From Swiss-Prot:
Keywords of this entry: Amino-acid biosynthesis, Arginine biosynthesis, ATP-binding, Cytoplasm, Kinase, Nucleotide-binding, Transferase
InterPro entries named in the record: AceGlu_kinase-like_sf, AcgluKinase_fam, ArgB, Asp/Glu/Uridylate_kinase, Glu/AcGlu_kinase, NAGK-C
Site (Transition state stabilizer): 32, 250
Protein name as catalogued: Acetylglutamate kinase
Family: Belongs to the acetylglutamate kinase family. ArgB subfamily.
């Protein structure tokens, strides 16, 4: 059993956190919440605690959550097989109904947990106030010779109106957002949560974008953690296949964000207890730092 930190150790931890609390006071931090951190009970409580604490010390956390594993489980229960192309879920009308139902349940659970830990969280989707406008996404399928593929009700972001989120921030609420957008005819679109988080970071002029994953960060082909990457290095890693699958939308979101003015993006291990606090409030941080150059 690991030894408990002494009072002096705790004082050192608080002293190390102080300059970061001062630096990020009043700043917006967009956090994409997903992976094991959403399914393991202790990790869920740690995340809710961390988010509430960041708000208490003066930061403005904005949460965007996924729900891939839970959606997959529900699709199996109703007899549907999930399919992915370039890390994006193929979404027909029936699948979209399941996506909205499951994301709604997840959203309320996150809101409730944060509130239990002293925060004031409010659950939203991009359809509320039509603040995330979307259109149909087409992707090239490399396995079909770069053929354009219709993914159904999978959307790409046309625009985000930050007014609703900014209003909630000024009233000291914590927005918790499910990644569903609305089309021009009122139709629902399933949008990759990493891309929604990146888009929100841009329009909110966020100080940081943090993406929680089920890996220590971005790994090279030997499985070693890459602690820092530039845009050029990311392009090279995608070209040689080191970055693939579900990591591609995360990296794309990170690159778009830092190229457009978000100061830093971090891809961190959501399986580490209090990893969010370690990233924001300590000297070393955790995971992979993405920079424009």
């Amino acid at each position: 059993m690991p030894s408990q930190p002494s009072s002096q150790d705790k004082a050192k931890i608080l002293a190390e956190a102080l300059p970061y609390i001062q630096r990020f006071h009043g700043k917006t931090i967009v956090i994409k919440y997903g992976g094991n951190a959403m399914t393991e009970e202790n990790l869920k409580k740690c995340f809710a605690h961390d988010v509430a604490l960041l708000k208490v010390v003066g930061m403005n956390p904005v949460i965007v959550h996924g729900g891939g594993p839970q959606i997959n489980d529900m699709l199996k229960r109703v007899g549907k097989q999930g399919a992915f192309i370039q890390g994006m879920r193929v979404t027909d009308a029936e699948t979209m109904d399941v996506v909205e139902m499951v994301l709604g349940l997840i959203n309320k659970e996150i809101v409730n947990l944060i509130n239990q830990h002293g925060g004031r969280a409010v659950g939203l989707t991009g359809k509320d106030g039509s603040f995330i406008r979307a259109k149909k996404m087409l992707v090239r399928d490399k396995e079909r010779g770069q053929e354009w593929v219709d993914l159904g009700q999978v959307g790409e972001i046309e625009g985000i109106d930050p007014a609703l989120i900014e209003l909630l921030e000024t009233r000291d609420f914590i927005p918790v957002i499910a990644p569903v957008g609305v089309g021009s005819r009122g139709e629902s679109y399933n949008i990759n949560a990493d891309l929604v988080a990146g888009g929100l970071a841009l329009v909110l002029n966020a100080e940081k974008l943090i993406l929680l994953t089920n890996t220590p960060g971005v790994l090279n082909k030997d499985g070693s953690l890459l602690t820092g990457l530039t845009a050029q290095e990311v392009d090279e890693l995608i070209a040689d296949g080191t970055i693939s699958g579900g990591m591609i939308p995360k990296i794309s979101s990170a690159l778009d964000a830092v190229k457009s003015g978000v100061k830093t993006c971090h891809i961190i291990d959501g399986r580490v207890e209090h990893g969010l606090l370690l990233e924001v409030l300590t000297d070393e941080g955790v995971g992979t730092l993405i920079k424009a150059n």
